[in-house]
């Protein structure tokens, strides 16, 4: 499935292909989302800060492989009727995503602080909120919680600011990522895992937090937060 998801980026250029290849093979969150069967089969998903659409490409490839009868028998079935939507503020990445996805997902050029979330089943924010000031983080989370349908899922990944050395490595990686977007001197706004959980729970979400840095020197945590029915 990772090979199929990467293949679509060849037409978008070598850098886009290499980036997708590296993310899908070395970032544990993509494997976890499919292997754990976290996503619903139907409804709608919005990936905020989707970049060049790697997660969307993975979900599209998984759906196609399942339809062709080539899905691993020991894995949970992937979403087959989940409408996919991505949002990113970087024009170049949006262009790459649209080319790679070839109509398999709706990808919009917009600042996530201003986007119309619309009612949805799943909201994904991977390594996104640390680039926003704390007040902005809270406003985005408030909008996200409101947009989620009852029983809906918010998938949030952020670094744990209490993780000492691993946190410094994660910040360095985030700064380098910002540099590739031409944002030299970007200030990061991080919280401890406990503070992230508390912030989500204050909005009525039931939160499960799990480390999401296997095979890396980082201290990322995946927060699986569900809106109570």
Positions of predicted regions on the chain:
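Helix-capping/helix-break motifs at membrane-protein junctions
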Residues: 133-134
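A short glycine-rich, Lys/Arg-flanked "PGG" loop and its adjoining helix->strand segment in the class I
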Residues: 138-150
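Conserved beta-strand/loop positions that form the S-adenosyl-L-methionine
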Residues: 48
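A conserved beta-strand element that flanks and buttresses the S-adenosyl-L-methionine
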Residues: 124
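Class I (Rossmann-like) S-adenosyl-L-methionine-dependent methyltransferase catalytic domain
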Residues: 1-44, 52-116, 153-229
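Short catalytic micro-motifs in class I SAM-dependent methyltransferases
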Residues: 127-128
């Amino acid at each position: 499935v990772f090979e199929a998801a990467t293949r679509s980026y060849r037409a978008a250029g070598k850098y886009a292909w290499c980036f997708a290849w590296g993310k899908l093979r070395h970032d544990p969150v993509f494997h976890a989302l499919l292997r754990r069967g976290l996503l619903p089969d139907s409804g709608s998903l919005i990936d905020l800060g989707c970049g060049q659409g790697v997660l969307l490409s993975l979900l599209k490839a998984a759906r196609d492989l399942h339809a062709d009868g080539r899905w691993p028998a020991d894995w949970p079935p992937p979403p087959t009727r989940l409408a996919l939507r991505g949002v990113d503020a970087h024009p170049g990445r949006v262009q790459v995503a649209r080319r790679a996805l070839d109509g398999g997902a709706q990808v919009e050029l917009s600042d996530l602080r201003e986007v119309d979330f619309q009612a949805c089943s799943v909201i994904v924010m991977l390594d996104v909120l640390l680039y926003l000031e704390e007040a902005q983080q809270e406003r985005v989370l408030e909008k996200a919680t409101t947009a989620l349908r009852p029983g809906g899922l918010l998938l949030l990944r952020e670094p744990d600011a209490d993780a000492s050395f691993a946190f410094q490595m994660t910040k360095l990686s985030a700064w380098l990522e910002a540099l590739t977007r031409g944002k030299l001197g970007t200030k990061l706004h991080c919280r401890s895992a406990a503070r992230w959980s508390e912030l989500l729970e204050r909005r009525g979400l039931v939160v499960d937090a799990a480390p999401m840095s296997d095979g890396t020197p980082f201290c990322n945590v995946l927060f699986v937060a569900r809106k109570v029915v």
